[in-house]
């Protein structure tokens, strides 16, 4: 899979932190997020899922993720937003790849991306969360176009 290296600034995010198998929690979290954004007219700049763990090292029932929207740095969570967190995704260097997801199979493009990235002799995966940005409404379109971001650091030569 082709990817590029890009430097991103910090992203302020608001949404829901969930624990459990990602194939269940992300879908549930996105549904919660959509209702919250609509009910509170949240000025969402981007829609993201943030992944905090390595599924090869952490049992599925303990996997952490957040379904969030990017908001302005000074955003204040509105009243009656039970369970909503305000956090940040760290800035820095990221490997970025675009993929189309069909049949809710988000795992396959991520595995292909990591397979390509792990072959790099210039960059290695950094110990920070990965995330994906949704470029369209997959529930409406029948597929999702996503940009996947993996934090990286240059390998010392």
UniProtKB/Swiss-Prot annotation:
It is found in: Cytoplasm. One of its GO terms (cellular component) is cytoplasm. SMART domains: AraC_E_bind. The keyword Zinc-finger does not apply. Keywords: Cytoplasm, Stress response. GO terms for molecular function: DNA topoisomerase type II (double strand cut, ATP-hydrolyzing) inhibitor activity. Its main location: cytoplasm. It comes from the Bacteria. Belongs to the DNA gyrase inhibitor family. Inhibits the supercoiling activity of DNA gyrase. Acts by inhibiting DNA gyrase at an early step, prior to (or at the step of) binding of DNA by the gyrase. It protects cells against toxins that target DNA gyrase, by inhibiting activity of these toxins and reducing the formation of lethal double-strand breaks in the cell. HAMAP family: DNA_gyrase_inhibitor. Interacts with DNA gyrase. This is DNA gyrase inhibitor. It comes from Klebsiella pneumoniae (strain 342). The gene is sbmC.
């Amino acid at each position: 899979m082709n990817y590029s290296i890009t430097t991103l600034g910090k992203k302020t995010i608001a949404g829901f932190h969930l624990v459990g198998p990602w194939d269940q929690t992300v879908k549930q979290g996105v549904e919660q997020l959509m209702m919250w954004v609509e009910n509170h007219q949240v000025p969402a700049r981007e829609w993201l899922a943030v992944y905090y763990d390595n599924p090869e090292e952490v049992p599925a029932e303990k996997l952490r993720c957040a379904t969030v929207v990017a908001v302005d740095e000074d955003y204040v969570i509105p009243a009656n937003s039970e369970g909503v967190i305000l956090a940040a995704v760290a800035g820095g260097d990221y490997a970025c790849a675009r993929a189309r997801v069909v049949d809710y199979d988000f795992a396959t493009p991520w595995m292909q991306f990591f397979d390509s990235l792990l072959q790099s002799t210039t960059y290695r995966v950094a110990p920070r969360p990965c995330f994906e940005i949704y470029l369209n409404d997959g529930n409406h379109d029948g597929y999702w176009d996503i940009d996947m971001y993996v934090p990286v650091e240059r390998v010392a030569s």
